[in-house]
Each structure stands twice: as structure tokens, then as C-alpha cells.
């Protein structure tokens, strides 16, 4: 109903009309009574305005019109000195409209409500009617539901602490600000604490601490006054922190990364796990046996055979197809495992079969050597016809030769073979060539025996040494039979 520019004009005219028609001054009087009790209660009824000056002495329609016009012009000129007003020459019921001033004075704030505009124009009127001592008194307290008007001539500076709205949040306080996105708060481990902190800031950030809001209605004031920033926030957030659902929701934090994790985590059901579109088929023992028998016969089934088998066992074609695929995979794996097992078994048997061969050779050779030793031992006393003292003496020298070193024993054996071969060549002939060629213990023994048969005197002094396992190196060649017979 009231525009921004015309609101002060109509509000002031309503108060001036009632004061002008109810005053006790004459037709030319433009002054207002100082006694507020003498002024009638303002009424906006048309009948009261028409019959306002009936009982006044000397009041004429012309004088009434002139008085009201003069009063309007005087008051508007004092209230708005920057604007030019014209006196209303017509009836006071249809006043001439006045154009709103282009420049708004500093003492009058823009876009005020009609109630505050009427109070603003009525307050300077009371200051003009009162004296200087009365102007030093503090202004009356404002009514409940009305805002405190600023003093005339003072610049209105908005105070964020006195306004009902919270101050503008910084970029760090914004939920999706740049500073917060770039920080480490979007880590999944910190998301739960950030959600509770944001909820606390939303509940307690609407009203700063210690701010009185007189302009609010009693219900709204009691509501905001009951919101204690510490007790109420802790009372609201305590069931959230103790809710067992939060522990379940920790496993769904990474399902929706980014800012949507906060929005979807609270609305997500506890059983979020997606159900599979297919269920695992459970076969009976009869069906499993029928499939196994067919698999033993035929690893790959054709489509007609598969349909026939499915009809016989009461299964679907897809179930039989999947079963054969899985069974073939299992068969391949078992086949590969068996082949690897056989390969490892063969590799383990090869070292165990070839190891006893070197140990068996000495056992086979030992009887021949022992037989040769027995022959030499039995032939020496019989052929030489030595006394017991001579045999003991030769055995002692032989033991001393063997006890010194292996090299000396082999050298002594070669020298003995050479000496016995020389004597044998002179007596019997033909034994020396063979004895020089052989260096083994068997050859020396045979040479010694042949030499002893031919010449007994030479062999009595130096008999051939007894062969042993560690005395001389063994030749892999078989020992030939001696040329000289008994």
C-alpha cells in the first residue's frame, strides 16, 4: 500500500489532519496545542474528519481549509527542508500529491516500515514542542515489537552484533570452500568429525553469544535463548556419537568419495551389500552322480546331448553347461597336478638308484684281492722253505717299509721287482721283461714267486713285499697270469 518514497508523506498527513481539525486555534492559527491531553484521539474515519470543526466557534469551511493547508505546509517544510511543497488549495480529503524528494536526507534511513516512519516524524515534533531542558532527557524506551530509531542527523551504521543475522562466514567456514577442499579434511578418517562439527556450527552459529534480541517476538526470542551453544549442542550430538549405526557406516565411507560421502552415508541402509542377480545352484546327489557318469564318458557334450541330460536330471540347459565348464577346469587342474607329482617322483628316484654303484665296486674287487693275498701268503713259505726266524725277519722289514710312506713302499716294491726279475732272467729266462713292465702289487708278487723258483738264494735275502690296499696305486686293467708256471 505504501511506496518507498510516498510513505513519509501519507504518514505525516494522517497525523497532521487529526491534529489540525482537533486544535482550539482560529481559522488562521497554525500552532498546535502543547498539552497532549487536549488533543483528541486521532481517527481516520471520514465522518470524524468531515465533522471535526463543527462545534468550534468561528470555524468556517474556508478558514478550516486554510488552517489545514497552512499547517500542512508548515510541518512538511520543517520536516523536509530539501523539498518544495505546495499548499493544498482544494479539500483536505483530496490533497495535492507531492513528488518525493530526489535526495534522501542523512537522518532518514531508506526503506523503513510505515510504523517506524510515523515514529520518526512524530519524534522531531515532540522535540520542537518541548524546551531545551526537556530535550536533554533520554528518549522513551521503545515499545515491544518496534526497532530503536536512530537520532536525527546521525549516520546509520549497521552493526553486525546487533542484527539478527550472523556475520558472513569466511572461506574456511564454508562447507565446500576452496580452502577446505584443498585441506586434508576430506580424508575418510576425518569425515565423521567434520560432519559433527558442521552440525554444531549450524545449530549454534545463528546467534552470537551474549547478544540480546529485543525486536523478536516472545516465542522466537525464547527459542533462540534456549539454544545454549555448549549444553544443547552436546545434548543433540550425544545420541549421534553413541549411535551404533556409525560403526556400521565406517565400512561404507569409501563407497561415495568426495563431498557426497557426507550426504549419502546417513541415508544409506545398513544392508547396502548388493544382492547377486543369480543364486548358486545346489545339486542333489542323484543329479551329481548322473553328471559325473556322463563326464567320464564324454568331456564335451553337444547341445542336443546337453538338453537331453538336463531333461533327464531335472536341470536347466544353462546349469548343465556351467557344471561341465567347471568340471573340465577341475579336471585340467587335477591332471596338471598329477603330472607334476609324477615328475617330482621320477626326479627323486634317479639320485637314489645311481648312488650305490661306487660302493659296490670295492666290494666286488675285494674278494679277488684277498684271494691274491692268500695265494701269495701260502706260496711264499712253501716255495721258499724258509725258517721261522727268516719269515719273522722279512715280515718285520716289510712292516717298517709300509709304515714309513706310500712312496717309499712303492719304490721298494719296484726295486724288489727289478732285482728278482734280473735273477729270474739269469736262471729260468724270460721273466724279466714282464716284471719291468708291471708296477702293480700283483705283478711284483708273481715276479717274486717266479724268481724264487729259479734262484732260491737271492729271494731268501729279499723277498717280495705283501700287497695291501693302501701300499700302491691300483690299475684298472685285469692282472694277467704269470708266464712262469709252478
Curated annotation (Swiss-Prot):
Residues 334-349, 363-372, 390-401 have a biased composition (Basic and acidic residues). Its main location: nucleus. SUPFAM superfamilies: Homeodomain-like. One of its GO terms (biological process) is T-helper 1 cell differentiation. Residues 475-486 have a biased composition (Pro residues). Residues 421-440 have a biased composition (Gly residues). GO terms for molecular function: DNA-binding transcription factor activity, RNA polymerase II-specific; sequence-specific DNA binding. Residues 373-383 have a biased composition (Acidic residues). It comes from the Eukaryota. Pfam families: Homeodomain (PF00046). Keywords: Differentiation, DNA-binding, Homeobox, Nucleus, Transcription, Transcription regulation. InterPro entries: H2.0_Homeobox_TF, HD, HD_metazoa, Homeobox_CS, Homeodomain-like_sf, HTH_motif. Transcription factor required for TBX21/T-bet-dependent maturation of Th1 cells as well as maintenance of Th1-specific gene expression. Involved in embryogenesis and hematopoiesis. Belongs to the H2.0 homeobox family. This is H2.0-like homeobox protein. The gene is HLX.
Amino acid at each position: 500500500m505504501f511506496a518507498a518514497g510516498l510513505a513519509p508523506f501519507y504518514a505525516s498527513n494522517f497525523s497532521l489532519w487529526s491534529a489540525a481539525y482537533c486544535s482550539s486555534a482560529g481559522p488562521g492559527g497554525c500552532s498546535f496545542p502543547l498539552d497532549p491531553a487536549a488533543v483528541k484521539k486521532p481517527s481516520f474515519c471520514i465522518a470524524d474528519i468531515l465533522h471535526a470543526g463543527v462545534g468550534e466557534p468561528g470555524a468556517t469551511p474556508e478558514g478550516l481549509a486554510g488552517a489545514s493547508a497552512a499547517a500542512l505546509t508548515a510541518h512538511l517544510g520543517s520536516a523536509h527542508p530539501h523539498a518544495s511543497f505546495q499548499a493544498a488549495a482544494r479539500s483536505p480529503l483530496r490533497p495535492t500529491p507531492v513528488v518525493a524528494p530526489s535526495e534522501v536526507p542523512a537522518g532518514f534511513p531508506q526503506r523503513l516500515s510505515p510504523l517506524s516512519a510515523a515514529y520518526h516524524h512524530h519524534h522531531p515534533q515532540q522535540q520542537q514542542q518541548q524546551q531545551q531542558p526537556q530535550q536533554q532527557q533520554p528518549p522513551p524506551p521503545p515499545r515491544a515489537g518496534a526497532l530503536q530509531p536512530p537520532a536525527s542527523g546521525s549516520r546509520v551504521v549497521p552493526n553486525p552484533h546487533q542484527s539478527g543475522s550472523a556475520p558472513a562466514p569466511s572461506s574456511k567456514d564454508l562447507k565446500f570452500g576452496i580452502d577446505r577442499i584443498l585441506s586434508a579434511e576430506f580424508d575418510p578418517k576425518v569425515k565423521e568429525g567434520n560432519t559433527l562439527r558442521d552440525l554444531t556450527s549450524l545449530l549454534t552459529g545463528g546467534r552470537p553469544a551474549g547478544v540480546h534480541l529485543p525486536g523478536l517476538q516472545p516465542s522466537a526470542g525464547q527459542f533462540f535463548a534456549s539454544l545454549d551453544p555448549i549444553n544443547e549442542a552436546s545434548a543433540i550430538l550425544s545420541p549421534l556419537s553413541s549411535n551404533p549405526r556409525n560403526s556400521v557406516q565406517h565400512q561404507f565411507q569409501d563407497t561415495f568419495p568426495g563431498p557426497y560421502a557426507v550426504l549419502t552415508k546417513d541415508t544409506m541402509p545398513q544392508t547396502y551389500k548388493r544382492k547377486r542377480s543369480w543364486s548358486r545352484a545346489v545339486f542333489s546327489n542323484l543329479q551329481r552322480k548322473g553328471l559325473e557318469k556322463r563326464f567320464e564318458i564324454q568331456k564335451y557334450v553337444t547341445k542336443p546331448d546337453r538338453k537331453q541330460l538336463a531333461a533327464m536330471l531335472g536341470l536347466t540347459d544353462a546349469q548343465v553347461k556351467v557344471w561341465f565348464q567347471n568340471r573340465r577346469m577341475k579336471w585340467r587342474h587335477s591332471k596338471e597336478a598329477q603330472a607334476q607329482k609324477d615328475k617330482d617322483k621320477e626326479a627323486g628316484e634317479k639320485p637314489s638308484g645311481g648312488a650305490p654303484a661306487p660302493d659296490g665296486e670295492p666290494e666286488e674287487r675285494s674278494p679277488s684281492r684277498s684271494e691274491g693275498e692268500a695265494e701269495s701268503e701260502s706260496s711264499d713259505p712253501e716255495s721258499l722253505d724258509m725258517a721261522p726266524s727268516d719269515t719273522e725277519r722279512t715280515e718285520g722289514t716289510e712292516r717298517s717299509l709300509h709304515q714309513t710312506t706310500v712312496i717309499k713302499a712303492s719304490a721298494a716294491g719296484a726295486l724288489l721287482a727289478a732285482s728278482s726279475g734280473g735273477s729270474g732272467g739269469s736262471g729260468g729266462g724270460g721273466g724279466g721283461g714282464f716284471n719291468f713292465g708291471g708296477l702293480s702289487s700283483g705283478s711284483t708278487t708273481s715276479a717274486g714267486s717266479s724268481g724264487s723258483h729259479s734262484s732260491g738264494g737271492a729271494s731268501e735275502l729279499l723277498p717280495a713285499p705283501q700287497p695291501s690296499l693302501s701300499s700302491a696305486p691300483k690299475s684298472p686293467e685285469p692282472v694277467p697270469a704269470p708266464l712262469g708256471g709252478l
